[in-house]
Design a protein with these regions (language model features):
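Short glycine-rich His-centered loop
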Residues: 31-50
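Bacterial N-terminal signal peptides that target proteins for export
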Residues: 1-8
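Active-site-proximal helix/loop segments of hydrolytic enzymes
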Residues: 28-32, 58-183
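Extracytoplasmic Gram-positive cell-surface binding/anchoring modules and repeats
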Residues: 54
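Bacterial N-terminal signal peptides
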Residues: 10-19
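Hydrophobic alpha-helical membrane context
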Residues: 17-18, 48, 119
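Sec-dependent signal peptide cleavage junction
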Residues: 19-29
Length: 183
């Protein structure tokens, strides 16, 4: 559970870096955050020692939502409630339906061989979504590193069509929502 606390703290601080100067005063429009617990349903994600990525992302997402809801001026939604399959486009569409200011997609670097470690944050390679995603990711990575997690960096990746590689980033960018995918 120590890692969950670290991720939550880093996420909160990342929001501060991104929206710190513009978190609304009482009565103003709230900052709307969508948290996407990666995988779900039949899509287990990575598996190691009886743990599945879909369950770990949900545990952390629920804890993050509970913590963030304690703060005035922040509205939080989860893209999926419970263990169900959702396409990446459906997740981005859900965030858009809530008028999300930011979409945070949660994953874990894990493998049976234990050859994946540390954390990395993926953001859009394009426009304002890149700038806002990178701003969030910078604060996030700085804090995760201070907490002792190995920094694998802030990254972008393109597919063979020259678009953002990760579907959740591509679909959220198409809807004008800055996003970050943390591994």
């Amino acid at each position: 559970m120590k890692i969950i606390r670290k991720v939550m703290l880093a996420f909160l601080m990342g929001l501060f870096f991104l929206y710190g100067k513009s978190i609304p005063a009482h009565g103003a429009q709230p900052v709307v955050v969508a948290i996407d617990p990666g995988h779900g349903g039949e899509n287990l994600g990575a598996e190691c020692n009886g743990y599945t990525e879909k369950n770990l992302t949900m545990i952390v997402a629920l804890a993050m939502k509970e913590e963030l809801e304690k703060y005035e001026g922040i509205e939080v939604y989860l893209t999926r409630e419970g263990d169900k399959d959702m396409s990446l486009e459906e997740r981005a569409e859900f965030a858009a339906s809530k008028n999300a200011d930011f979409l945070f997609c949660l994953h874990f670097n894990m493998s049976a061989e234990h050859d994946l470690f540390g954390s990395e944050v993926w953001v859009s390679a394009f426009g304002e979504e890149h700038q806002e995603g990178y701003s969030f990711a910078s604060g996030e990575m700085e804090l995760l590193e201070e907490m002792g997690l190995y920094p694998r960096g802030i990254k972008t990746r393109l597919n063979d069509r020259g678009e953002d590689y990760y579907g959740i980033i591509r679909h959220s960018t198409a809807r004008g929502i800055p996003s970050a995918l943390i591994e």
